Amino acid sequence: IVSVVGGMPVIIPALGEQIDQQYLLQHIDGLVFPGSPSNVEPHHYRGPASDAGTLHDAARDSTTLPLIKAAIALGIPVLGICRGFQEMNVAFGGALHQKVHEVDGYMDHREPEDTPVGQQYGLRHALHVQPGGLLAGIGLPDEIQVNSIHGQGVQRLAPGLRVEALAPDGLIE
């Protein structure tokens, strides 16, 4: 998508403090933080330790969390998708459910392992766009269908962030 509109995508390696963030941020117009099979480590949001075997990526956390805050402070647009969205919340002081599917009242947002990959990443549920937000402001309808594959989810929204859309179970997406 970036190339289609005349931009040049740049992959930022997960090198933490080895990256000169100020230099990097002076040379980009926006950041996209994509999904990943790994989860944000719970110590970043004062959560309980994860179950043994939970996949984390400390190098990514040490790169993305400070980079998100620095980009926003400079007015650089940031888009978080899947894990990237969870990172945005944590970077600003929010907390996550580690396993949304184990929280009463929430549906299972993980990929159904017993279905083909093409269906796993297909449209999964409705998303209710909230009035007054950016998504509503660009003309999205009140309800859209989305794919939704994640184990973690927003437990407490970070100060300064606002809800743009909700899953049918009320989970912020």
Provide a role label for each language-model segment.
Residues 82:
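Conserved G/P- and acidic residue-centered "switch" motifs that form tight phosphate/ATP-binding loops
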Residues 85:
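The feature captures the ABC ATPase H-loop/switch
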Residues 1-79, 89-97, 101-145, 151, ...:
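N-terminal beta1-alpha1 cap of cysteine-dependent amidohydrolase-like domains
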